[in-house]
């Protein structure tokens, strides 16, 4: 069904209305920049709060599986709930065609409960999101105003600080968060999970998510290819203090499975269909979900472009360190600047998405031959696979380096294993070795050196141990 809905709903809409006002929310017009522009040509007004029927579903550490409904019209529902003023409050706001009781929304709360005590409020506006895309994009304004109203009730009635509020919005939900933030002075943080492009990219700041909407705005871009012709749903525009572009921000690894295997997904037909239609777009919240339980597995590197990142021009982290994409990005919030900052990293194809980046530099010994070289790292937490370091003419004394992303943080590196081959019959049986291999983890400035005086024939592993002091001189 989602396949049949998605594209037509992006295109449908109707022209009507000029201005409408709602109690406690203010007035909404169809004047520029909200409508009648090249980006927003259709003149639509947002639906009424009654028609959208936004619900605020509270989960806490005390009720992690059954929500309590908080009502804007009755603050006593907050007082009677498990909401605790001493805790941070994180709102999770879904996007187009989604709903507040979707598995990923509830799972995000559950992951949080494993690492913190928190008020987790799922914002359900499915009646306003399950319509034509253009109408849903306009309904964002009312839903954002309602989220701001809920925060205002917390501030006024419960002496709660807006600085303790974190809004997490996916797709259209990211712009809901932006609207709420623009109405809430001192809002602590907004996380935009692949903010949607259509009707928002290139608009003035009051229409979309932007850095002024909270003290700290971080954004994860996973579907930033142009909507036409590539059907990329997310925006490529930098709209936060920190904008993260995992895997380049456009095409996520693991999203190119064939249609049947993608639709008949292990999580069921519905989840599989969603992934087939919008796999890249959905990866943003999947990365965030996993980041909650992996506080150091999504280190992101400041870099001018993904091409530079893949060309090994952005390693290691600068002196001030690298932020972690996702839940813990705000630990780096003191390093925000006036200009938006762009960060890159790679992820895995599927769970587990977390990766740890290493650079390996090796100096050859032995004969001059043509071949390819791989190394694997062994540490206190485990070992990596064999990773490609060099392919070409292997010359003794020459040094080559490469970077790779490991599925685990190996911990304290204890040894390195070297392997070479060329699969060419050579009656002289040449031997090649690595006199020294230097390993550096991306988040660290320290280099670790491993040495060997041996050489080996192809396809035979050579183990290098930490260099003696005299070996590194």
Swiss-Prot record:
Record GO cellular component, one term: extracellular region
Task: Provide the active-site residues from the annotation.
Answer: 171 (nucleophile), 194 (charge relay system), 281 (charge relay system)
Disulfide bond entries: 21-27, 109-120, 255-279, 303-314, 317-322, 451-467
**A Pfam family of this chain:** Lipase
Where does it mainly reside?
A: secreted
- Any one GO BP annotation for this protein: lipid metabolic process
The signal peptide, as residue positions, is 1-17
* Localisation per UniProt entry: Secreted
Return the protein name. Inactive pancreatic lipase-related protein 1
Does Amino-acid biosynthesis show up as a keyword for this record? Answer: no
- What the protein does? May function as inhibitor of dietary triglyceride digestion. Lacks detectable lipase activity (in vitro).
Query: In which tissues or organs does this protein occur?
Result: Expressed in female, but not in male, lacrimal gland. Expressed in male and female sublingual gland and pancreas.
Q: Which keywords describe this protein according to UniProt?
A: Calcium, Disulfide bond, Metal-binding, Secreted, Signal
Pinpoint the PLAT domain residues: 356-467
Null allele outcome, as annotated, is:
Mice have no visible phenotype during the first 10 weeks after birth and are fertile. Adult mice have normal body weight, but higher than normal body fat and lower than normal lean mass. They display impaired glucose tolerance and decreased insulin sensitivity, and obesity and insulin resistance are exacerbated by high-fat diet. Their pancreatic juice has greater ability to hydrolyze triglycerides than that from wild-type littermates.
Binding positions (Ca(2+)): 205, 208, 210, 213
Alphabetical list of PANTHER family matching this protein? INACTIVE PANCREATIC LIPASE-RELATED PROTEIN 1, LIPASE
- InterPro entries for the chain: AB_hydrolase_fold, Lipase, Lipase_LIPH, Lipase_N, Lipase_panc, PLAT/LH2_dom, PLAT/LH2_dom_sf, TAG_lipase
- The highest taxon in the source lineage is Eukaryota
**What species is this protein from?**
Mus musculus
């Amino acid at each position: 069904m989602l396949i049949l809905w998605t594209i037509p709903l992006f295109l449908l809409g109707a022209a009507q209305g000029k201005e409408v006002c709602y109690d406690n929310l203010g007035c909404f017009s169809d004047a520029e920049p909200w409508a009648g522009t090249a980006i927003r040509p259709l003149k639509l007004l947002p639906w009424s709060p009654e028609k959208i029927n936004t619900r605020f579903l509270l989960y806490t550490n005390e009720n992690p599986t059954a929500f309590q409904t908080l009502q804007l019209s009755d603050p006593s529902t907050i007082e009677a709930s498990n909401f605790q003023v001493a805790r941070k409050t994180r709102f999770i706001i879904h996007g187009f065609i989604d709903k507040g009781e979707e598995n990923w929304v509830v799972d995000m709360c559950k992951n949080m409960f494993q690492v913190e005590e928190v008020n987790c409020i799922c914002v359900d506006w499915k009646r306003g999101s399950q319509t034509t895309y253009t109408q849903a994009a306009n309904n964002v304004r009312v839903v954002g105003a309602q989220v701001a109203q809920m925060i205002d009730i917390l501030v006024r009635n419960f002496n709660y600080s807006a600085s303790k509020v974190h809004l997490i919005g996916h797709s259209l939900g990211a712009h809901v968060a932006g609207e709420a933030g623009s109405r809430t002075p001192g809002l602590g943080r907004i996380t935009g999970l692949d903010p949607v492009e259509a009707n928002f990219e290139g608009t003035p700041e009051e229409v979309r998510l932007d850095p002024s909407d909270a003290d700290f705005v971080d954004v994860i871009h996973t579907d930033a290819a142009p909507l036409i012709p590539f059907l990329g749903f997310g925006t490529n525009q930098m709209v936060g203090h920190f904008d993260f572009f995992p895997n380049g921000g456009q095409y996520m690894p693991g999203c190119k499975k064939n249609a049947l295997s993608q639709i008949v997904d292990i999580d069921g037909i519905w989840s599989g269909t969603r992934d087939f239609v919008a796999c890249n777009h959905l990866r943003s919240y999947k990365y965030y979900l996993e980041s909650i339980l992996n506080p150091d597995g999504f280190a992101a590197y400041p870099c001018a472009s993904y091409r530079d990142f893949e060309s090994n021009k952005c390693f290691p982290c600068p002196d001030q360190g690298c932020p972690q994409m996702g839940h813990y990005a705000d630990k780096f919030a003191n390093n925000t600047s006036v200009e938006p900052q762009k960060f890159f990293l790679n992820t895995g194809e599927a769970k587990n998405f977390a990766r740890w980046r290493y650079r390996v530099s090796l100096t050859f010994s032995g004969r001059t031959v043509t071949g390819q070289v791989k190394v694997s790292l062994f540490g206190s937490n485990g070992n990596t696979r064999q990773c490609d370091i060099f392919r070409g003419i292997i010359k003794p004394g020459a040094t080559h380096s490469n970077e790779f992303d490991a599925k685990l943080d190996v911990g304290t590196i204890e040894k390195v294993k070297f392997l070479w081959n060329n699969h060419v019959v050579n009656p002289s049986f040449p031997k090649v070795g690595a006199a020294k291999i230097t390993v550096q983890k991306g988040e660290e400035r320290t280099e670790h050196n491993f040495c060997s005086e041996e050489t080996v024939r192809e396809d035979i592993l050579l183990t290098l141990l930490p260099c003696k002091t005299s070996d590194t001189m």
